[in-house]
Amino acid sequence: MRSDQQQAINRLAGTSATAFLCAVLCVYPLYIDKFSNLGVTKFTGCFTLFLLFLLWLVACTAIGARAPRPRNANAGRDVTLWGVLAFAGTSLISTFTSLSPTASTWGLGGYYGGLMLVLFTAAGYWAVRSYLDLENLDFVFWVLGITTSIVAVLYVLNIFNIDLIGAYADTAVVERAQFFSTLGQKDFNGCFFSVALPIVFYQFLNAKDTRNAVWTGIPAAFGALALAVVDSEALALGIGAAVMVLVCHKNFTTRHLRRAALISAAFFGWAAWMHYMRASVYTQGGTALLAKLG
């Protein structure tokens, strides 16, 4: 195979990996449905998306696509991959030692997914890690910032019963305390933000120039809004884990500290505004993070 053909196939595989990652992180979270349907629909969509992408990547590999070479000597020592394999392995053991391995495999006893969702997620991570061109990550994370901003605004609007997506049209009044949005419910929302906000904040903290700082700072401001208003422990857990990772890296500069102070100021500003609005405007209830801190 000629070198130009090889490069074209490699670019095709890399572009496919970028599109898949963008769909999972940036497009898929905007799916709209009622809370009662999200368990089945989201699993079906996730299963289909992962299966199609993996089959396409297998086809690219069959015609000669190769993973890009690591940019440094330590790139192959990815402890995250070992963590994913360990999690998938423990899920496999717990599934086959459960009272009903079949139900555990597909998650039929409660939230849909079970072992199959874990395995497909692990396979998707491995595929993206293997073929993604790192130069495309900035674009993916920028689009993720847009998605994060949209979901944060929808969350706040739904708190005040401003229903832009028609979620309340056929919902009983007594059920409206459960948050309906692009992610369906506050725990779905919190889990999304636990993944998205560390990335959005990291992009802002490490922006290299003023222009990038502005473009990444806008999603970071909406991320601070989400951090202030989302009533879910999953978000606090995700942010806590991200902070611990940053502390372990020990590569802070005065620029990082200044931008972290801006994020903190935005958080407390949004939290104070939300506290005032909850006290003076009828809402669906829930507790802001600042109120939980006393």
Task: Please state what every model-predicted region is.
Residues 1-11, 66-77:
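Membrane-interfacial, low-structure loops and terminal tails that flank and connect transmembrane helices
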Residues 2, 8-31, 46-60, 83-97, ...:
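Alpha-helical transmembrane segments of multi-pass inner-membrane proteins
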Residues 30-44, 65-68:
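Short, hydrophobic transmembrane alpha-helix segments
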Residues 36, 101-108, 182, 228-232:
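Membrane-interface helix caps and helix-loop-helix hairpins in membrane proteins
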Residues 41-43, 104-114, 178:
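Non-cytosolic membrane-interface motifs at loop->transmembrane helix junctions
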Residues 58-74, 92-106, 131, 160-163:
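Transmembrane alpha-helix boundary signature
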Residues 68-76, 132-140, 254-257:
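Interfacial helix-loop-helix linkers and transmembrane-helix boundary segments
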Residues 274-294:
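Periplasmic/ER-lumenal interhelical loops and adjacent helix-loop junctions
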